[in-house]
Amino acid sequence: MFAVLKTGGKQYKVQAGDMLRVEKLAADAGETVQFNDVLMIGGDAPVVGAPFVSGAAVQAEVVEQIKGDKVIKFVKRRRKHSSKRTVGHRQKLTLVKITEILASGADASGVKAATGKGEAAPAAKAAPKAKAAAPAAAGSDDLTQLTGVGPAAAKKLEAAGLTTFAQIAALSEDDIAGIDAIKIKPEWVEQAKELAQG
C-alpha cells in the first residue's frame, strides 16, 4: 500500500518505512506528526482524491531537523563593472520516517497535524480579532467620526482612557492640558457634545 501526500508545496509517493526529507516542520525529534493532505491511496483498491482523499492521512515520526546541501549563488557583472558576489544557502529540512498510512479515520487519530515552521494555527489568527471586537462592543463609541481623528489618533485617545463621546464632551481646558498622549483640539469637544446628544 502506498500514498501520495502533499507537504511544503511538493508531492511525495510514500510507503510505510520510507525515510523522507521534507520542508521544515514545527515538530521536535521523536514526535509523531500526521500529513492530512493525501492526494491518492494506492494498493488493491486505489482511491484518488478530488483534490484530497477525505479521512485519509499519513503518519510519520520526526527523526531530526537537518539542513540541505549548500547551494552557491554567484553573481558576476561583466565588462566594465568588475564586481562579483557569492552567497550560500542551506535549506532547512525535516527528516521523517513514515510509520503508517491511514485510509480512513484520520480525524479521530489524535496525532498532531504536520505544519510548517512559519505557519500559524487558524484558531490563533481568529483570537486577536475577537479580542479587538470586544472593546468596541463594551459601550465605546467610534471616535473616528470626529473630524481629524483617524485610527491612530483613536488608539491614542483610548490609551488616554477616552472611549466615548460623552467623556470627550465633558473635558475642561485643564483636563485637556493634563493629557500628554494626544493633543485634543477644541473642535473635537464641540463635535463630541453634538454626537453624544444624538
Swiss-Prot record:
Q: State the taxonomy lineage.
A: Bacteria, Pseudomonadati, Pseudomonadota, Alphaproteobacteria, Rhodobacterales
Single Gene Ontology BP term?
translation
Q: Mind naming one GO cellular-component term on file for this protein?
A: ribonucleoprotein complex
Name listed for the protein in its UniProt record: Large ribosomal subunit protein bL21
Question: Looking at the record's lineage, which domain of life comes first?
Answer: Bacteria
Q: Which organism is it from?
A: Ruegeria sp. (strain TM1040) (Silicibacter sp.)
Q: Which Pfam families match?
A: HHH_5, Ribosomal_L21p
Q: What does this gene product do?
A: This protein binds to 23S rRNA in the presence of protein L20.
Keywords associated with the record: Ribonucleoprotein, Ribosomal protein, RNA-binding, rRNA-binding
What Gene3D superfamilies does this protein map onto?
Answer: 5' to 3' exonuclease, C-terminal subdomain (1.10.150.20)
